[in-house]
């Protein structure tokens, strides 16, 4: 997912996105454990997408608290 798409979402949307990505990552890990995953690069990209979403989420949360 692109950072521009993530930055357009609000805090609740980002939290939902992080949960969705974590579920997807868990599913990929289970596929890898049972040797059903063909493209292991998806694990890396999903993990990095989670990190991007969490980073932007923290930025937005800190911006909200500093604005108050």
Swiss-Prot record:
GO terms for cellular component: cytosolic large ribosomal subunit. GO terms for molecular function: structural constituent of ribosome. Transmembrane segments: none annotated. Belongs to the universal ribosomal protein uL29 family. GO terms for biological process: translation. It holds the Pfam family Ribosomal_L29. It comes from Albidiferax ferrireducens (strain ATCC BAA-621 / DSM 15236 / T118). The lineage of its organism: Bacteria, Pseudomonadati, Pseudomonadota, Betaproteobacteria, Burkholderiales. It comes from the Bacteria. The keyword Repeat does not apply. This is Large ribosomal subunit protein uL29.
